[in-house]
């Protein structure tokens, strides 16, 4: 059994800062769960175009508000506490912060190693680590 406390992640290499957002990597590939689990903090008004072409992602909003735009259909979906979205088709999208900071619980498959950064498409490359 693994027990991970958020307080033990903050300020370590498992707390990753990106373009305006920060992500706490709770479970990673080396934890051998078959997925990775993150808490992502998204600031009000911030937006980022992404396309996880190498990963599937499910995101559950537990606080704040914002929206996600499906770039294939143009549909915009409001996000707030209790809403989940799943990028089950490697969907190109724009995530936008609303009027309050969003707190998002994210699951990636395949799991990330924690070393990934968004590329020019807004995707994570598949990263191999030494813990396989």
Swiss-Prot record:
GO MF: ectoine synthase activity
Any GO BP: ectoine biosynthetic process
Catalytic EC class: lyase
Keyword match Cell membrane: no
Record-listed E.C. numbers: 4.2.1.108
Transmembrane segments annotated in the record for this chain: none
Superkingdom of source: Bacteria
CDD domains assigned: cupin_EctC
Catalytic activity: (2S)-4-acetamido-2-aminobutanoate = L-ectoine + H2O
Family: Belongs to the ectoine synthase family.
Role, per record: Catalyzes the circularization of gamma-N-acetyl-alpha,gamma-diaminobutyric acid (ADABA) to ectoine (1,4,5,6-tetrahydro-2-methyl-4-pyrimidine carboxylic acid), which is an excellent osmoprotectant.
Protein name: L-ectoine synthase
Protein source organism: Alkalilimnicola ehrlichii (strain ATCC BAA-1101 / DSM 17681 / MLHE-1)
Encoding gene per record: ectC
